Amino acid sequence: MKHTVEEVRLKNGVQGLLIDVPDAAVMNFTFQFRAGSRYTRSRDIYETAHIMEHMAFGANARFNSEHEFEADFTKNGAYHNASTSDMNMSYIADCADFEWERILDLQLLSIATPKFNEKEFIAEKGNVRNELTGYLNNNARLLWPKLQQAFGEQVLTYEERIKTISNITLNDIKEHHKKTHTTDNLRFVIAGKLTKSRKSKIIEKFENLDLPRGERFEFIVDDPKVPEKPVYINRSDQKNISFGFSVIIPRQLDDYEMDAMHALN
């Protein structure tokens, strides 16, 4: 597919890629913050980032509820989602080319001006609890955090994560957003039909984004250790066996190494 890539680095710390695909009929948006579970204030509230992500498309400066925002966002078929990992929180959206600006404005609105409220907070705590409880029947979901812990990574298992949910308050959500959602911590990729005028509009929107300056958090690298013995999870109710092998590199891979690993995988 014919395309050109332009790197953007703005004075307010925002960085990203603009990918021009001249014949594209849709626009794709990805926004990422280093705001995952490892960046929460305490392990006792580990699921703060996950719950905040679930509240990402709720009430904000323009819409009073998630229902109102969702109805407006998707009225022409646009799609959005969000995800949280140990390190990152990502927001994505896809839309038809003709409404790219409206969807970009709505995405930035939800990211920059959420109005976290108690009603949506209680609802999403329950949704996150149900989601994680469902993973307890997935052998792979149980195995990999145990392997990570065995190699020295400071992560929690799904059982441990569920136990932290009751510790989290609405103020924890607001605090985590304030800490992590800054212009310096924002990275983006936008792909579609990006004319010169569209690029100028996009850059202007990021330059005027209603977020404070802050910190681009360092990628967390734990001190690795060699497990003394294999990790076993005994589940007497299971009729099959799931197993995995993990090789740990004790540093962050550079871009070329990541590309090579993706090809290898």
Region roles according to the model:
Residues 1-2, 75, 224-227:
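Short solvent-exposed loop/turn micro-motifs enriched in small/polar/acidic residues
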Residues 9, 59-62, 67-216, 232, ...:
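Charge-rich, well-structured scaffold segments of protease-associated domains
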Residues 17-20, 177, 229-234:
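Short, surface-exposed beta-strand/loop micro-motifs that present aromatic residues
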Residues 22-73, 245, 255-265:
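Active/ligand-binding-proximal structured segments within catalytic/core domains
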Residues 126, 218-228:
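Short proline/glycine- and acidic-rich turn/helix-capping motifs at secondary-structure junctions
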